[in-house]
Amino acid sequence: MSHCPKLYFISFADSRMSAATDRIREQARDMDVFDEIHVLNEDSLDDAFCQTWKEIMKYGSRGYGYWCWKPYVILRLMEKMPDNAVLLYCDAGCHLNPKGKKRLMDYVESVMSSSIGVKAFYTFFKQYDVIERRWTKGDVFDYFKCRDRKDITDSKQIATTQIFLRKCPSSMRFLREWNNIWYENFSLIDDSPSKSPNFPDFVENRHDQSIFSIMYKLYDIQPLPSGETDVADYSNMDEFPIWDVRDRGYKDTRFVARVKRWLKARKILLRIRYLRIKERIEKFLVKK
């Protein structure tokens, strides 16, 4: 990369996760690449925003209000950044690894060369495939008029756990479109039942991530390499800068997080197997 852009870092979690936000702030400093580091909590949000979402933005709610704050805090900072500056958003549960600085700069170079100025990773779990149609409600596919596009429905979902953005007109348009969904059609975000049919193997909606993922594919953006943030095997992660640990700062976090991930994966696998068996039975009955 001939010229290193100005680099920004941002993360957010409510104040119950102060241990996680303190940790990721220090890790961002230890990376020694960011010109500005912004680690926020609910006190960082504007009064008008809090008033708008006060009914859902409560402690214990999913994503502290279905992650309504995520596109908002990213967009708010991007609007203040100079053109062509690069922002890395990470969930506060991530860990940053200074040994992976070289690979981090590869990601920066990738978003610098992107015509859209947005880069993210596929969602990656070794236990099961995170295929879009299983993790996005039917209404979202119909809203974006892509229900019949197998390149979207049958491909892996794009994660919003880590996002690289370069400030340019196309990335700002992307962010505003993503953010506006909360205001224009909140039922696409939440856990309310889909009005239109879900796919037969649907498991659950992934809220902000479902919207982001569909948009990412419609914008025809190439994802970053899959599996470079997964921490199933720490021994192979030294060269990678961002670890998807889900370390929320609670006591015995690493062990508890692993147990929770295992239990959730098992529940999801059982749900997927049930749907597959149901589909086979229905096909058999139709043939008879």
Model-predicted segments: where are they?
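Glycosyltransferase catalytic domains, chiefly GT-A lineage
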Residues: M1-K288
